[in-house]
Structure formats: structure tokens, C-alpha cells
Amino acid sequence: MTRLFVLLCAALAVVLAGCATPEGPATRLDKANILPLELDDAYQFRKILTSVFDPNLDEQRVSGAKTGGVIDFERARRTWGAVDSLEVSKRHGSYFTLFWRTSKDSDVTLRLEYRQAGLGNFVMAQERYFPAARGSHRSTFQVTGDEFLENGLVSAWRALLIVDGRIVALRQSSMWR
């Protein structure tokens, strides 16, 4: 009986480990097309977390000043596994974590549109596609590497949930216009 229990637990662990796959890279769009706005209460953003890992901000820190454990932990988490300065510089950038939910079964596209300091009003965009999405989801986007080093910080952003070619949920930064 104990052997059967151990085998069942091992099988369950293998199945659950297969479900916990990391998100692949987001699809970058050449041009963000304009879509009609038809907000629907069945789709909503719950929370959006933004963080910046910028070498210039690190250098501006006063030596010996306390930044708090959370900021230092976030910086250490972003650079975990980087073995040289090139790998660390590829991880500098803006990070977005979006928590959203839907109460309907539908194919949902999550889009992050953003402007960067060096590009003025030009809008960049990244997308993730979720077939038959229902329930709560956590998705991440990042603007890092050469894109960040050449074009600068993300100065404004907006997140969209798109279903059947229409915007059903929207959240934006205060700088978006």
C-alpha cells in the first residue's frame, strides 16, 4: 500500500511539473494596429507590477545609502545566472507583470503597447496569445537588451485584452495619451 502511494505521488509530481512550463518570449509587433474599444466586465486586469533594472539608476545611488531589501533582491533575481557583464547588460530594462482574469472561455490576446524615451511618440508593442483562456492568469513582458540600451526607459505603456479583434479590457499608465 505504501509503495502504491509513493508511485502515485511520483506520477502526480511528474504531471504537475509538466504543467509548470515557463512562458515563451512575447511576439514583437512591427506596427500596433488600432482596434475598436468594446469593454466587457467579463475581462479585467487585476494588478500590474512594473520594475526597472537600469545601470544608470544603479550608478546614481549614493554609496552607503539603504535601498531596502526588496530592491536589492529584485536586482539580484534579475542577474541570477549571468556570468559576465555582457549577460548582465542584456538583462537591463523594464519588466511588466500583468495579472488578469476572464470569466468566459475565449481566445484572448494580451498586448502591451509602450513608448520609450528615445523614440518619442512611436508606439512599440508585444503580444501573447492564450487559446481558450478562462480564469486568472499571470503574464510577463520585458523590454531589455539592445532595445532598452538604444531606446531608453519605457516612458508610457498600456495593456490590452483583445478578443475577436476588439479591446475588451484596458489599463494604462498615467503618462499614456
How would you name each of these model-derived features?
Residues D40-R75:
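Post-signal-peptide N-terminal segment of Sec-exported extracytoplasmic proteins
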Residues V6-A17:
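Bacterial N-terminal signal peptides
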Residues Y129-H137:
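Short proline/glycine- and polar residue-rich coil/turn motifs
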Residues G64-T102, R138-V143:
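Contiguous beta-strand segments within globular domains
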Residues R166-R177:
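Short beta-strand elements
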Residues L86-M124, P131-A132:
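Mature extracytoplasmic domains of secretory-pathway proteins
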Residues A17-L35:
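Bacterial Sec signal peptide processing site at the extreme N-terminus
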